[in-house]
């Protein structure tokens, strides 16, 4: 499930439809995704599956609001014009995407679950260009605002900085995380700095061009122990042997406050908590990260966005918007009173949506066949002795 905001437009999606709702005048446009285009032969038993079970995993407006793309778990990537809703391209990806982003020039970069990153043009409908590959599943991808570098993360704790688009030239590695890295973003008030977080309970500031860690902040003590115990139980339910001491970060959102400070908001998998921090300072000045508040909503945030000092949160219960005022997020009653139509729409879409639990793929299953081998050996030796 995904949504995005630009101006007064809110794009909301479920399995097969995107609805763009204008919160000022209440206008709605519903777009049904086109059929999947593929040259590969699909077996009949899988064909029905593809058309009946496909969920939109990402819908995003470009930075200038000219375009938006829709990406689904059936490897479909569609690009539209925002104003007239025209379909510009309908592509089939090589593999399912794990993260999709616009570049500053409105091209699209896709990181997939096999560890590859592709670049797709917004002006041409040709096939994507393979940029680079990891040996592990990619979890996030970022093309810097100056379009000089592409930064990628994976499930094996690595952050790789490469030249863009000639990504065979590796600039540096940012090594410091001890678990998978789910989110990377440029610091809004100082684009030479990278902010990262994931499954190890810290978020780190980097001088990414040289792979140097500038500051690391631990947020483990902000998570209630009962929430961690509940999460560990869910890991066991998925037959994962791992036990964690911190919740993995689901979303990291940043927004500039002024020329020397930015807001940071984190949400977590299977938890209703949002943590808010202020990052102040620059590379030339000393960085400082200050805890601001914890926001507890009624359910796990399915998606959240920072847009013009407003925090938009979507949960199973609908949308809620907070405004940053006097160093705290408080409910934005001016916008929330306009969301009744949007929330009614969400209730309809929610009933048709396919629920997905994505966090289990972040943790690796451990297979121990040594004990089984020893038991077989013991039995074999016993038979020989007899």
Please place each PLM-identified region on the residue numbering:
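Short loop/turn segments that connect beta-strands within beta-propeller blades
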Residues: 24, 82-85, 122-125, 164-167, ...
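Short C-terminal beta-strands that terminate individual repeats in beta-propeller domains
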Residues: 30-33, 47-50, 88-93, 128-133, ...
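Terminal intrinsically disordered, low-complexity extensions flanking WD-repeat/beta-propeller proteins
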Residues: 212-386
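Beta-propeller domains
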Residues: 11-42, 75-78
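Hydrophobic beta-strand positions that form the internal "hydrophobic ladder"
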Residues: 10, 68, 108, 150, ...
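Residue-level marker for isolated small/hydroxyl-bearing positions within beta-strands
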Residues: 12-14, 71, 111, 153, ...
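Canonical WD40 repeat/beta-propeller blade segments in eukaryotic WD-repeat proteins
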Residues: 1-3, 47-61, 95-102, 136-143, ...
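Short coil/turn segments within WD40 beta-propeller repeats
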Residues: 16-18, 74-78, 98, 114-118, ...
